[in-house]
Amino acid sequence: MGYIKSQEEIAQIENALARPVYRNSQRLAIEFLIEKKSLARILPPPLQPTDTPLVVASVGRWQSNVVGDFSGAAIHVAASHHGVLGMYVLAIYMNREHPIIYGRDVVGEPKKWAHAELFKGGSLVSGLAERNGRPLFSLNAEMSGESGIGPAQSFTYNFKSRTSASGYGLEEDAILTKTTWKNDFRVFEIGEGEVKLVGGPHDPLEELQPIEIIRAIYSEYDTSGTCEAVDKIESKTFLPFHYGRMDSWNLLDSNSHMSPHEELTS
């Protein structure tokens, strides 16, 4: 329990880190298409765009064996690596510290803090994400009563990268990780929906304007994940993507005309 962990404690910690389980999950997702050139531009190599420029905006809440209860929101984009189709985590927001730290340190998810809520009343489902008083995106859907079959297995891609201690460049090449999810869906409802994306200096979601809404999905499920490092990208090549996943530090000068909080909400 102290600052120096025993071998027994380390084993328990690593077992939890290596085998995350998320139970009683509830999630609203809106699938939509963007321009192919837009999707290709935001994908870091070695990820490749898929034939369908699919983006998924989602809001949900979860219980877990490793980071407690939390709610969150995310933007995933379709991508492929060596022929394995998955979803690249472009942006992801959590309402608690533990899932943020876990996602960043272990998996490489670009997690930031935000307020996220999911609402369901009958066939109507909605979700929203807000950060520092500014809306990030909102989802609204009406379920048709049609039930689908959720994927028993799915994949997400992330990059682990570290800013150099000097402030210039990265400490080493970025690592591409792949998480394999084993899903057990109890509810997988299909419907129609809409998504509203709000851009800002730190969260440029306006780059993902939908050209076609595919469908809305409301799901309830349990899932477990295993993550592995599958590739690397040269630090200089990944640097623009690395900083694109963060807030813009150059806009957070206390001596500027706006305070840091005002910069985040402008």
Model-derived segments and spans:
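Acidic/histidine-enriched active-site and ligand-binding environments that engage anionic O-linkages
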Residues: 47
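Intrinsic-disorder/low-complexity recognition with aromatic hotspots
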Residues: 20-23
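Interaction-surface and assembly-scaffold signal
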Residues: 3-5, 9-11, 107-266
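Structured soluble/peripheral alpha/beta segments that form catalytic or ligand/cofactor-binding pockets
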Residues: 10-13, 25-29, 34, 42, ...
